[in-house]
């Protein structure tokens, strides 16, 4: 505020709690990038009745539900499924186990999250979805960080395609 900032704009903020550290006099706006991803899936997945939006964990269910609602608002009402992954971690960035909650058999699953960091959660979720009969597994994330082992994990994964925005610049 003392620097003259009167508004902060973010895209799919990872930790909404940080907005509480901003002065009440400073406006805070967070925009969702989900609509940018929906268009890619609408144009590239032929049978929309076989799409299932998947939350990679309980923390992302609101985002997945919003993505699901926006998909339906794009003309696919009552055609798109919704599922969730339940994951357990003992330490940060290391997922011990994931369980599928919902019907994904024969579906084109789209895992929706705000960011992909080391891709551990994403790759384990994709594998679990395929083990439960998913026809294909895609991912959409606003922020593609791709830290540390992410590239090798993704290369070795069962993921069919990852779609991210350009919110994080990469040299390669």
Predicted ranges, named:
Residues 1-172:
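PRPP-associated nucleotide enzymes
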């Amino acid at each position: 505020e003392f620097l003259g900032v009167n508004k902060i704009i973010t895209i799919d903020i990872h930790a909404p709690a940080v907005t509480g550290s901003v002065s009440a006099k400073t406006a805070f706006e967070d925009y969702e990038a989900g609509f940018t991803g929906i268009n890619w899936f609408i144009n590239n997945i032929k049978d929309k009745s076989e799409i299932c939006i998947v939350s990679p964990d309980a923390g992302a269910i609101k985002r997945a539900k919003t993505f699901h609602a926006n998909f339906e608002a794009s003309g696919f009402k009552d055609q798109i499924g919704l599922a969730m992954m339940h994951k357990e971690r003992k330490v940060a960035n290391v997922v011990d186990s994931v369980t599928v909650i919902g019907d994904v058999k024969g579906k084109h699953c789209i895992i929706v999250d705000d960011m992909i960091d080391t891709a551990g959660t994403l790759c384990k979720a994709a594998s679990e979805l395929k083990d439960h009969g998913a026809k294909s597994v895609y991912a959409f994330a606003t922020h593609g960080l791709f830290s540390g082992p992410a590239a090798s994990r993704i290369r070795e994964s069962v993921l069919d395609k990852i779609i991210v925005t350009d919110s994080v610049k990469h040299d390669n």
